[in-house]
């Protein structure tokens, strides 16, 4: 009879049967409050998890609060979705705390899909499709970038006023050492530029091109927090974050200043290695140039000792300064100041010798007068005349003139002339010399 009634009302009899069977099975002398500590911890964890998911369990007045009593479990409600992005990828309030940086130790906790633009630059909607990517985020700097052929699928939601490149943007690698931060921040800046955020990057004067919005600042902070773990940050970055843990713009500004300083250091090293001096410029200017370079390098942590500095300076000396390489090469403890004392001594000696030379500059008017009366005497022609050939070189007119005069002269003169050729010539001098015609 009782079984017939149960068969007529299967849903009621099933519940009654379950309740009766359950009550018989749990009917023991054990105190329901006597529960082990491990089970209490499990209950606490379950309740905490339920509170975090913001799910409520409806209270049932029909079922007593007995942990051993079987009661129907409520259906699990899936967490709400925020557009195309999964809920587990969104940052919570606890994770926004700086102490929660450890939650982002793995790339899968990134608050946006890897290799894509910031979520704020894509219109939300069910049409957007974001493919899954392998766990290659956080790879070293040498890892090749994704292939350029990987692009988003075309969608009707792409026609929007918002900016979209429809290309995967590779995020920066994971920072693994404080010494790698200068190289890492370069990839981080490149990542921001590829994400259409180049306008908010500080310029040389430390100010961005355009103001930054709150959403963009949140994106900067999240990306920096994920890929730059706090234990691998340099000391100066930790000092900035200790004042304001969201001041990523100040970190970028300081990083750009350090990049420019590194460029200046490289230029100073190249200049110091290629020094040249031959006395054409003042020694004071050369000394000031070299000492300023050495001081800048020492202040930036690149120490140049006296031995290395002297070798670099002496290698660039030429001319009269070249011998300093050989006179000073045995002095191991020579300083840069001592080397420049020798350079100054040679330079002053050169200047003194140039000033002591006489200056023979003539008046231009004198040069003009001399040019008028000057004859060409560069190579005067010296002619040696032979007396025997002199008489033979007379012209015919001179000979004819002599003949005519001899015919017109009296005979007495001719006789005296003929006699003078045979008689010796008497010289009235103290030596009493006689010249004969044959010896003349």
Swiss-Prot record:
GO terms for molecular function: RNA binding. Residues 1-93, 126-173, 352-440 are annotated as: Disordered. The modification Phosphoserine is found at residue 416. InterPro entries: TYA. The record marks 401-402 as: Cleavage. Residues 153-165, 402-418 have a biased composition (Low complexity). Residues 1-10, 48-60, 127-152, 419-428 have a biased composition (Polar residues). The keyword rRNA-binding does not apply. Residues 299-401 are annotated as: RNA-binding. It is found in: Cytoplasm. The keyword Phosphoprotein applies. Induction: Ty1-BR is a weakly expressed element. Induced under amino acid starvation conditions by GCN4. GO terms for cellular component: cytoplasm. Keywords: Cytoplasm, Phosphoprotein, RNA-binding, Transposable element. GO terms for biological process: viral translational frameshifting. Capsid protein (CA) is the structural component of the virus-like particle (VLP), forming the shell that encapsulates the retrotransposons dimeric RNA genome. The particles are assembled from trimer-clustered units and there are holes in the capsid shells that allow for the diffusion of macromolecules. CA also has nucleocapsid-like chaperone activity, promoting primer tRNA(i)-Met annealing to the multipartite primer-binding site (PBS), dimerization of Ty1 RNA and initiation of reverse transcription. Homotrimer. The C-terminal RNA-binding region of CA is sufficient for all its nucleocapsid-like chaperone activities. Retrotransposons are mobile genetic entities that are able to replicate via an RNA intermediate and a reverse transcription step. In contrast to retroviruses, retrotransposons are non-infectious, lack an envelope and remain intracellular. Ty1 retrotransposons belong to the copia elements (pseudoviridae). This is Transposon Ty1-BR Gag polyprotein. It comes from Saccharomyces cerevisiae (strain ATCC 204508 / S288c). The lineage of its organism: Eukaryota, Fungi, Dikarya, Ascomycota, Saccharomycotina.
